[in-house]
Protein backbone atom coordinates (compact mmCIF):
# COMPACT_ATOMS: atom_id res chain seq x y z
CA UNK A 1 0.00 0.00 0.00
CA UNK A 2 1.51 3.29 -1.12
CA UNK A 3 1.66 6.17 1.36
CA UNK A 4 2.09 9.90 0.78
CA UNK A 5 3.06 12.24 3.62
CA UNK A 6 2.16 15.82 2.81
CA UNK A 7 4.28 18.19 4.88
CA UNK A 8 6.91 15.65 5.88
CA UNK A 9 9.71 17.88 7.20
CA UNK A 10 8.30 18.37 10.70
CA UNK A 11 8.60 16.11 13.71
CA UNK A 12 5.27 14.39 13.00
CA UNK A 13 6.34 13.74 9.41
CA UNK A 14 9.59 12.17 10.55
CA UNK A 15 7.75 9.93 12.99
CA UNK A 16 5.30 8.85 10.29
CA UNK A 17 8.20 7.74 8.08
CA UNK A 18 9.91 5.93 10.98
CA UNK A 19 6.79 4.08 12.12
CA UNK A 20 5.48 3.25 8.66
CA UNK A 21 8.86 1.68 7.91
CA UNK A 22 7.87 -1.02 10.41
CA UNK A 23 4.41 -1.60 8.88
CA UNK A 24 3.78 -4.93 7.19
CA UNK A 25 1.90 -3.50 4.20
CA UNK A 26 2.73 0.20 3.93
CA UNK A 27 5.47 1.89 1.92
CA UNK A 28 6.09 5.63 1.97
CA UNK A 29 6.49 6.59 -1.70
CA UNK A 30 6.02 10.35 -1.42
CA UNK A 31 7.23 12.83 1.21
CA UNK A 32 6.41 16.40 0.26
CA UNK A 33 7.95 19.74 1.12
CA UNK A 34 7.82 23.11 -0.57
CA UNK A 35 10.79 24.42 1.40
CA UNK A 36 13.36 21.67 0.80
CA UNK A 37 12.20 20.05 -2.42
CA UNK A 38 14.93 17.78 -3.80
CA UNK A 39 16.65 17.32 -0.43
CA UNK A 40 17.11 13.81 0.90
CA UNK A 41 14.72 12.98 3.72
CA UNK A 42 17.64 11.83 5.88
CA UNK A 43 19.26 15.27 5.59
CA UNK A 44 16.29 16.74 7.47
CA UNK A 45 15.61 13.67 9.62
CA UNK A 46 19.09 12.25 10.35
CA UNK A 47 17.64 9.41 12.41
CA UNK A 48 16.26 8.02 9.13
CA UNK A 49 19.65 7.74 7.39
CA UNK A 50 19.90 4.16 6.15
CA UNK A 51 16.18 3.71 6.79
CA UNK A 52 14.83 5.46 3.68
CA UNK A 53 16.27 6.62 0.37
CA UNK A 54 13.45 9.09 -0.30
CA UNK A 55 13.95 12.71 -1.26
CA UNK A 56 11.38 15.43 -0.68
CA UNK A 57 9.19 16.33 -3.64
CA UNK A 58 6.63 19.06 -4.21
CA UNK A 59 3.88 17.61 -6.40
CA UNK A 60 0.49 19.17 -6.97
CA UNK A 61 -2.44 17.35 -5.38
CA UNK A 62 -3.35 15.94 -8.80
CA UNK A 63 0.13 14.45 -9.14
CA UNK A 64 0.13 12.54 -5.85
CA UNK A 65 -0.17 8.79 -6.41
CA UNK A 66 -0.96 6.92 -3.20
CA UNK A 67 -3.52 4.78 -1.46
CA UNK A 68 -3.39 6.80 1.77
CA UNK A 69 -2.22 10.36 2.41
CA UNK A 70 -1.26 11.74 5.80
CA UNK A 71 -1.57 15.50 6.13
CA UNK A 72 1.15 16.75 8.49
CA UNK A 73 0.67 20.38 7.54
CA UNK A 74 0.06 23.39 9.82
CA UNK A 75 -3.39 24.09 11.20
CA UNK A 76 -5.65 25.85 8.67
CA UNK A 77 -3.61 24.37 5.77
CA UNK A 78 -5.18 20.91 5.71
CA UNK A 79 -8.47 22.08 4.25
CA UNK A 80 -6.90 22.91 0.89
CA UNK A 81 -5.95 19.26 0.29
CA UNK A 82 -8.65 17.02 1.68
CA UNK A 83 -11.44 17.12 -0.88
CA UNK A 84 -9.11 16.90 -3.87
CA UNK A 85 -7.40 13.83 -2.42
CA UNK A 86 -10.68 12.13 -1.55
CA UNK A 87 -12.08 12.78 -5.03
CA UNK A 88 -9.10 10.88 -6.43
CA UNK A 89 -9.89 7.89 -4.22
CA UNK A 90 -7.04 8.50 -1.78
CA UNK A 91 -7.83 7.88 1.88
CA UNK A 92 -6.79 10.74 4.15
CA UNK A 93 -5.71 11.07 7.78
CA UNK A 94 -5.45 14.75 8.69
CA UNK A 95 -3.10 15.56 11.57
CA UNK A 96 -4.03 19.25 11.45
CA UNK A 97 -6.93 20.66 13.46
CA UNK A 98 -9.01 21.62 10.43
CA UNK A 99 -11.71 18.94 10.72
CA UNK A 100 -11.64 18.00 14.40
CA UNK A 101 -14.27 20.47 15.56
CA UNK A 102 -17.69 21.60 14.35
CA UNK A 103 -17.25 24.42 11.85
CA UNK A 104 -18.48 27.28 14.02
CA UNK A 105 -16.28 26.22 16.93
CA UNK A 106 -13.24 25.74 14.68
CA UNK A 107 -13.66 29.21 13.20
CA UNK A 108 -14.01 30.79 16.62
CA UNK A 109 -11.04 28.95 18.15
CA UNK A 110 -8.63 29.24 15.20
CA UNK A 111 -9.76 32.64 13.97
CA UNK A 112 -10.15 31.69 10.31
CA UNK A 113 -13.03 30.94 7.97
CA UNK A 114 -13.17 27.28 7.00
CA UNK A 115 -13.27 27.17 3.21
CA UNK A 116 -14.29 23.53 2.70
CA UNK A 117 -15.90 22.10 5.82
CA UNK A 118 -17.53 18.72 6.18
CA UNK A 119 -17.86 16.44 9.18
CA UNK A 120 -15.20 13.80 9.80
CA UNK A 121 -14.88 11.03 12.40
CA UNK A 122 -12.68 12.07 15.32
CA UNK A 123 -9.80 9.63 15.37
CA UNK A 124 -9.51 8.58 19.00
CA UNK A 125 -9.86 4.80 18.50
CA UNK A 126 -10.34 3.91 22.16
CA UNK A 127 -13.59 5.90 22.10
CA UNK A 128 -14.64 5.93 18.43
CA UNK A 129 -13.33 2.72 16.89
CA UNK A 130 -16.46 1.77 14.96
CA UNK A 131 -16.89 5.29 13.59
CA UNK A 132 -13.33 5.10 12.23
CA UNK A 133 -13.35 1.59 10.82
CA UNK A 134 -13.52 1.51 7.02
CA UNK A 135 -13.82 5.27 6.57
CA UNK A 136 -11.98 7.27 3.90
CA UNK A 137 -11.22 10.37 5.99
CA UNK A 138 -10.28 10.79 9.65
CA UNK A 139 -9.47 13.89 11.69
CA UNK A 140 -6.58 12.96 13.97
CA UNK A 141 -6.94 14.37 17.51
CA UNK A 142 -4.65 16.89 19.15
CA UNK A 143 -1.95 15.70 21.52
CA UNK A 144 -3.29 17.30 24.71
CA UNK A 145 -6.89 16.12 24.12
CA UNK A 146 -5.66 12.57 23.55
CA UNK A 147 -3.92 12.28 26.91
CA UNK A 148 -6.60 14.24 28.75
CA UNK A 149 -9.59 12.42 27.33
CA UNK A 150 -8.12 8.98 27.96
CA UNK A 151 -7.42 10.02 31.56
CA UNK A 152 -10.96 11.19 32.28
CA UNK A 153 -13.25 9.21 29.96
CA UNK A 154 -14.17 6.34 32.32
CA UNK A 155 -15.51 8.76 34.96
CA UNK A 156 -16.70 11.59 32.73
CA UNK A 157 -20.40 10.80 33.13
CA UNK A 158 -20.05 10.87 36.94
CA UNK A 159 -18.27 14.23 37.12
CA UNK A 160 -19.38 17.74 37.99
CA UNK A 161 -16.03 19.33 37.13
CA UNK A 162 -12.86 18.15 35.39
CA UNK A 163 -9.62 20.12 35.62
CA UNK A 164 -6.81 19.08 33.29
CA UNK A 165 -3.22 20.03 34.13
CA UNK A 166 -0.75 18.97 31.42
CA UNK A 167 3.01 19.15 31.07
CA UNK A 168 4.43 18.80 27.56
CA UNK A 169 7.80 18.40 25.93
CA UNK A 170 9.10 21.11 23.60
CA UNK A 171 8.55 19.11 20.40
CA UNK A 172 4.83 19.81 20.78
CA UNK A 173 5.55 23.35 19.60
CA UNK A 174 6.92 22.08 16.27
CA UNK A 175 10.31 22.58 14.67
CA UNK A 176 10.17 26.31 13.92
CA UNK A 177 12.55 28.18 16.26
CA UNK A 178 11.01 30.68 18.67
CA UNK A 179 11.87 32.52 21.86
CA UNK A 180 9.45 30.27 23.73
CA UNK A 181 11.37 27.13 22.80
CA UNK A 182 14.87 28.64 22.78
CA UNK A 183 17.12 26.50 24.98
CA UNK A 184 18.02 29.15 27.61
CA UNK A 185 14.33 29.94 28.05
CA UNK A 186 13.28 26.30 28.41
CA UNK A 187 16.13 24.68 30.32
CA UNK A 188 15.72 24.34 34.10
CA UNK A 189 12.18 25.69 33.89
CA UNK A 190 8.56 24.55 33.94
CA UNK A 191 6.46 27.27 32.36
CA UNK A 192 2.68 27.66 32.13
CA UNK A 193 1.23 29.15 28.96
CA UNK A 194 -2.22 29.94 27.57
CA UNK A 195 -3.46 29.11 31.04
CA UNK A 196 -7.17 29.48 30.23
CA UNK A 197 -7.23 29.90 26.45
CA UNK A 198 -5.44 26.94 24.84
CA UNK A 199 -7.11 25.86 21.60
CA UNK A 200 -7.16 22.19 22.58
CA UNK A 201 -9.71 22.90 25.32
CA UNK A 202 -12.42 22.93 22.65
CA UNK A 203 -11.60 19.34 21.69
CA UNK A 204 -11.63 18.25 25.33
CA UNK A 205 -15.07 19.78 25.86
CA UNK A 206 -16.36 18.21 22.64
CA UNK A 207 -15.28 14.74 23.72
CA UNK A 208 -16.84 15.16 27.16
CA UNK A 209 -20.14 16.05 25.49
CA UNK A 210 -19.91 12.93 23.35
CA UNK A 211 -19.42 10.94 26.55
CA UNK A 212 -22.69 12.46 27.84
CA UNK A 213 -20.79 14.32 30.52
CA UNK A 214 -22.25 17.52 31.91
CA UNK A 215 -19.07 18.49 33.69
CA UNK A 216 -17.44 21.89 33.57
CA UNK A 217 -14.00 21.53 31.98
CA UNK A 218 -10.81 23.54 32.53
CA UNK A 219 -7.30 23.12 31.11
CA UNK A 220 -3.87 24.60 31.78
CA UNK A 221 -0.74 23.42 29.90
CA UNK A 222 2.90 23.76 30.92
CA UNK A 223 6.12 23.48 28.95
CA UNK A 224 8.74 21.01 30.20
CA UNK A 225 12.47 21.13 29.39
CA UNK A 226 12.30 17.74 27.64
CA UNK A 227 11.92 16.75 24.00
CA UNK A 228 8.94 14.42 24.14
CA UNK A 229 6.00 13.46 26.27
CA UNK A 230 2.82 14.74 27.86
CA UNK A 231 1.92 14.03 31.46
CA UNK A 232 -1.69 14.98 32.23
CA UNK A 233 -3.23 15.13 35.68
CA UNK A 234 -7.02 15.13 35.57
CA UNK A 235 -8.75 16.28 38.75
CA UNK A 236 -12.21 14.74 38.46
CA UNK A 237 -14.72 16.17 40.93
CA UNK A 238 -17.59 13.72 41.29
CA UNK A 239 -21.24 14.25 42.14
CA UNK A 240 -21.13 11.24 44.46
CA UNK A 241 -18.09 9.66 46.13
CA UNK A 242 -16.37 6.54 44.82
CA UNK A 243 -13.75 4.58 46.73
CA UNK A 244 -10.41 3.35 45.39
CA UNK A 245 -11.61 -0.15 44.58
CA UNK A 246 -14.56 1.24 42.64
CA UNK A 247 -12.58 3.65 40.50
CA UNK A 248 -9.86 1.10 39.76
CA UNK A 249 -12.48 -1.40 38.65
CA UNK A 250 -14.16 1.22 36.45
CA UNK A 251 -10.89 2.10 34.72
CA UNK A 252 -9.67 -1.46 34.26
CA UNK A 253 -13.03 -2.56 32.86
CA UNK A 254 -13.24 0.46 30.56
CA UNK A 255 -9.85 -0.22 28.98
CA UNK A 256 -9.63 -4.00 29.36
CA UNK A 257 -9.65 -4.58 25.58
CA UNK A 258 -7.41 -1.63 24.67
CA UNK A 259 -3.94 -2.82 23.72
CA UNK A 260 -2.47 0.70 23.77
CA UNK A 261 -3.75 1.67 27.24
CA UNK A 262 -1.77 0.28 30.17
CA UNK A 263 -2.88 0.63 33.77
CA UNK A 264 0.42 1.38 35.48
CA UNK A 265 2.26 4.28 37.07
CA UNK A 266 2.64 6.79 34.22
CA UNK A 267 5.98 8.21 33.18
CA UNK A 268 6.77 10.03 29.97
CA UNK A 269 10.10 8.18 29.88
CA UNK A 270 8.36 4.80 29.70
CA UNK A 271 6.17 5.68 26.70
CA UNK A 272 8.81 7.58 24.69
CA UNK A 273 8.72 6.49 21.05
CA UNK A 274 5.67 4.28 21.59
CA UNK A 275 1.92 4.45 20.96
CA UNK A 276 1.05 3.56 24.54
CA UNK A 277 -0.92 5.60 27.02
CA UNK A 278 -0.03 4.70 30.60
CA UNK A 279 -2.43 5.80 33.30
CA UNK A 280 -3.34 5.34 36.93
CA UNK A 281 -6.14 6.62 39.14
CA UNK A 282 -6.51 7.43 42.83
CA UNK A 283 -9.64 8.36 44.76
CA UNK A 284 -10.24 10.41 47.86
CA UNK A 285 -14.01 10.14 47.69
CA UNK A 286 -15.55 12.93 45.64
CA UNK A 287 -12.20 13.88 44.07
CA UNK A 288 -10.48 11.40 41.81
CA UNK A 289 -7.04 12.06 40.35
CA UNK A 290 -6.27 10.31 37.06
CA UNK A 291 -2.81 10.70 35.52
CA UNK A 292 -1.86 9.72 31.97
CA UNK A 293 1.40 9.72 30.03
CA UNK A 294 1.78 9.65 26.25
CA UNK A 295 4.44 10.48 23.68
CA UNK A 296 3.07 13.63 22.06
CA UNK A 297 4.62 12.72 18.70
CA UNK A 298 3.35 9.12 18.65
CA UNK A 299 0.07 8.49 20.49
CA UNK A 300 -0.41 12.26 20.39
CA UNK A 301 0.14 12.51 16.62
CA UNK A 302 1.77 10.10 14.15
CA UNK A 303 1.25 6.79 15.95
CA UNK A 304 -2.41 7.48 16.48
CA UNK A 305 -2.68 8.51 12.82
CA UNK A 306 -1.30 5.10 11.81
CA UNK A 307 -3.62 3.40 14.30
CA UNK A 308 -6.47 5.17 12.50
CA UNK A 309 -5.13 4.16 9.09
CA UNK A 310 -5.05 0.54 10.23
CA UNK A 311 -8.71 0.73 11.22
CA UNK A 312 -9.63 2.48 7.98
CA UNK A 313 -7.88 -0.11 5.82
CA UNK A 314 -8.56 -3.33 7.73
CA UNK A 315 -5.08 -4.00 9.11
CA UNK A 316 -4.26 -5.16 12.61
CA UNK A 317 -4.58 -2.11 14.81
CA UNK A 318 -1.02 -2.37 16.12
CA UNK A 319 0.63 -2.91 12.71
CA UNK A 320 3.72 -0.68 12.67
CA UNK A 321 3.10 0.27 16.29
CA UNK A 322 4.08 -2.82 18.26
CA UNK A 323 7.34 -1.43 19.66
CA UNK A 324 7.91 -0.73 23.34
CA UNK A 325 8.95 2.64 24.68
CA UNK A 326 12.60 3.74 24.64
CA UNK A 327 13.73 3.55 28.26
CA UNK A 328 15.93 4.73 29.81
UniProtKB/Swiss-Prot annotation:
Q: Does the keyword Cytoplasm feature in the UniProt annotation?
A: yes
- SUPFAM superfamilies in alphabetical order: Glyceraldehyde-3-phosphate dehydrogenase-like, C-terminal domain, NAD(P)-binding Rossmann-fold domains
Q: What Gene Ontology terms for biological process does this UniProt record contain?
A: L-arginine biosynthetic process
**InterPro entries membership:** AGPR_AS, AGPR_type-1, NAD(P)-bd_dom_sf, NAGSA_dehydrogenase, Semialdehyde_DH_NAD-bd
Catalysed reaction equations from the record: N-acetyl-L-glutamate 5-semialdehyde + phosphate + NADP(+) = N-acetyl-L-glutamyl 5-phosphate + NADPH + H(+)
Entry-linked Pfam families: Semialdhyde_dh, Semialdhyde_dhC_1
Compartments where found: Cytoplasm
Principal subcellular localization: cytoplasm
**What Gene Ontology molecular-function terms does this entry list?**
N-acetyl-gamma-glutamyl-phosphate reductase activity; NAD binding; NADP+ binding
Q: Which GO terms describe its cellular component?
A: cytoplasm
- Keyword entries, A-Z: Amino-acid biosynthesis, Arginine biosynthesis, Cytoplasm, NADP, Oxidoreductase
The reply on keyword Cytoplasm is yes
Tell me its EC number(s), please: 1.2.1.38
Alphabetized SMART domains for the sequence: Semialdhyde_dh
- Record pathway: Amino-acid biosynthesis; L-arginine biosynthesis; N(2)-acetyl-L-ornithine from L-glutamate: step 3/4
* Superkingdom of the source species: Archaea
**What does UniProt list as catalytic?**
143
Q: Which PANTHER family match?
A: N-ACETYL-GAMMA-GLUTAMYL-PHOSPHATE REDUCTASE, CHLOROPLASTIC-RELATED (PTHR32338:SF10), N-ACETYL-GAMMA-GLUTAMYL-PHOSPHATE REDUCTASE, CHLOROPLASTIC-RELATED-RELATED (PTHR32338)
Its biological purpose is as follows: Catalyzes the NADPH-dependent reduction of N-acetyl-5-glutamyl phosphate to yield N-acetyl-L-glutamate 5-semialdehyde.
Assigned protein family: Belongs to the NAGSA dehydrogenase family. Type 1 subfamily.
Protein name listed in UniProt = N-acetyl-gamma-glutamyl-phosphate reductase
Query: Which gene name does the record give?
Result: argC
